[in-house]
Design a protein with these regions (language model features):
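N-terminal export and membrane-targeting signals
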Residues: 21-47
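Hydrophobic alpha-helical membrane-insertion segments, chiefly the h-region
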Residues: 47-58
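N-terminal extracellular/periplasmic Venus flytrap/periplasmic-binding protein-like
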Residues: 66-169
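Solvent-exposed, acidic/polar segments of extracytosolic/periplasmic ligand-binding ectodomains
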Residues: 76-87, 91, 363, 451-518
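Beta-alpha junction/loop-to-helix N-cap segments that form part of ligand/metal-binding clefts
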Residues: 123, 138-217, 223, 286-296, ...
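Extracytoplasmic ligand/sensor domains, especially the bilobed periplasmic-binding protein
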Residues: 176-283, 337-367
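Extracellular/periplasmic periplasmic-binding protein-like sensory domains
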Residues: 224, 329-423, 508-514
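Short, charged, surface-exposed loops that flank catalytic or proteolytic processing sites
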Residues: 411-414, 434-448
Length: 518
């Protein structure tokens, strides 16, 4: 769903620190480039720790950039391996079938229960996978072969189990040809386990910066954006909008985790240097095991930004660190301009944290996104905010199979950034590349075919284009505003139900090409 309809229920209510979780989870689940599944439990712990911190901690407690050590990062000098050098192994392919793994977070795991308790589409993931795989198989399959879907439910908080699954898929039985991660819950080092170590193709919605695909190349392909060109776009927009400039004091708050440090040092800082900007950088502990340190670091970062006269802030934080940082801004009643983005899903997560409890910190903030945020969940014309062609095709197939409302919902439409369209899009993408690879399907022919896909109708993003050295799909970005629709206005598109949206993303600037990567 594009927005929360729970505004009235929270008007006049006392602050409850867990209140925003249900709303925010309906946005966080979309990326993946997002760490949303792992973060379900993390944020609950953060809230408890944050309350204690805000009540008990004195100002100026040690923390911040001096106490949060950066994890080892991948070098930006790492070069991508071209598809032409991929393995020619056909492991997982027989004369009649292609074994493909579909990892799905187990609904009976605590992470699944907490993370998706209010997301009714989440319960439809396995039926959706079967539906879209069967659609391909019933139409003749892939050059005479049928996809054999191996749906594996797992607990994303159990790292040892995920490592064991990776080894089973890439080395054990049954042999697996590829892994498809529709919603982006198979992330970070687990991606590299499958691709770099296991030399097994992985299509995933979770993304970070170029270094990751370089390490996983030529087997790692993202339906989300590479964050290197996205951060470049963020800086360009920041300058053009007046949020960044030599006369504007800029702060960057970044976690100590390897992908975030990599994004800062290898991409964001060089982008800022090109336009003559030197930011004040504050580091916040980002580990799920460092909740107390994260809270104190966030508090101190805000204190230092405030004392230095910072006017704009770029967050490079996972949800478990972004949440305490915004809470610290609110506690200190200091509200700078935030430059949000798809990086760690800050533009998506922000909508879930208004109007309660962080409206002052987040309402009206803007950012860049490659996603189709700002639309509506129905089949009205695309020009009026309805589905893009890729999502519309997914909806048509789903509605023919499931003409009634999804259980627990009132309407039969699928979510524009929800899990059904995400699985539909990536399954179709895989099938296209596998067909283009021809009868001699192996790892090399598959990734070579992936590298030749252009202008493919995307789902989370309007189109996907790949290349021999372009391992991510999105090609465009837009600027959107996080908007609390109170009083009700036409800024938020009216659903067909006639019930106005409580919050929404409002398009500020239409889609334009992403800067070239590298």
């Amino acid at each position: 769903m594009e927005a929360s309809m729970e505004v009235s229920a929270h008007r006049g209510a006392a602050f409850h620190p867990l209140a925003p979780l249900g709303r925010s989870w309906r946005r966080m689940r979309r990326r993946p480039r997002a760490t949303q599944v792992r973060t379900a439990l993390i944020i609950i712990a953060i809230v408890v720790g944050l309350i204690a911190w805000l009540v008990l901690a004195p100002t100026g407690m040690p923390g911040g950039s001096d106490s949060a050590g950066a994890a080892e990062v991948a070098s930006s000098s790492t070069k991508a391996t071209p598809p032409s050098q991929a393995s020619t192994s056909s492991r997982g392919v027989t004369g009649t079938s292609i074994n493909v793994v579909f990892p799905v977070v187990a609904i009976n795991s605590l992470a699944g229960k907490e993370g998706f308790a209010e997301d009714k589409e989440y319960n439809e993931q396995i039926p959706a996978i079967h539906l879209y795989v069967n659609q391909i198989n019933n139409a003749g399959g892939i050059n005479g072969r049928k996809i054999n879907p191996i749906i594996v439910q797992y607990d994303p908080t159990n790292d040892a189990n995920m490592q064991a699954l990776c080894q089973q898929w890439t080395q054990g039985s049954p042999a697996v040809f590829a892994v498809i991660d529709g919603i982006g819950s198979w992330e970070q080092d687990d991606q590299l386990c499958v691709t770099q170590q296991g030399q097994t193709p992985l299509l995933s919605a979770w993304s970070t910066t170029t270094n990751w695909t370089n390490l996983g190349s030529p087997y790692l392909w993202w339906t989300g954006p590479d964050m290197a060109p996205l951060l470049d776009a963020l800086v360009q927009w920041g300058v053009s909008s007046g949020r960044l400039g030599k006369a504007v004091k800029l702060g960057v708050v970044v976690s100590d985790q390897a992908p975030d440090q990599d994004a800062l040092n290898d991409f964001l800082l060089p982008d800022l240097k090109k336009v003559g900007i030197t930011p004040l950088v504050q580091t916040v502990a980002g580990s799920a095991d460092a909740t107390a340190t994260t809270n104190s670091d966030a508090q101190l970062a805000v204190e230092k930004f405030k004392a230095a006269g910072v006017q704009s802030v770029i967050p490079l934080l996972r949800e478990n660190a972004f949440f305490p940082y915004v809470a610290a801004e609110t506690a200190q009643q200091w509200y700078p301009k935030l430059l949000l983005s798809d990086y760690q899903s800050s533009i998506e997560v922000a909508l879930g944290l208004i109007p309660v409890p962080y409206e002052k910190a987040l309402n009206g903030q803007e950012g860049v996104t490659t996603e189709t945020l700002g639309g509506i969940d129905d089949n009205r014309p695309q020009s009026q905010g309805g589905y893009d062609p890729g999502v519309r095709a997914c909806y048509t197939t789903w509605h023919a199979y499931h003409p009634g409302p999804i259980p627990g919902t009132l309407y039969h439409y699928i979510e524009e950034q929800g899990p059904i369209q995400a699985w539909c899009g990536v399954i179709g993408l895989f099938a296209t590349a596998a067909k283009d690879a021809g009868k001699n399907l192996n790892r090399r022919t598959f990734v070579e075919a992936m590298s030749k896909i252009t202008n493919y109708p995307g789902t989370l993003s309007p189109t996907w284009t790949f290349g021999p050295d372009k391992f991510y799909g999105p090609t465009q970005y837009q600027v959107v505003e996080v908007h609390n629709n109170e009083p009700k206005s036409a800024l938020c598109k009216m659903p067909k139900s006639g019930i106005a949206q409580g919050t929404c993303w409002v398009t500020v600037q239409p889609f334009k090409p992403l800067p070239a990567s590298g």
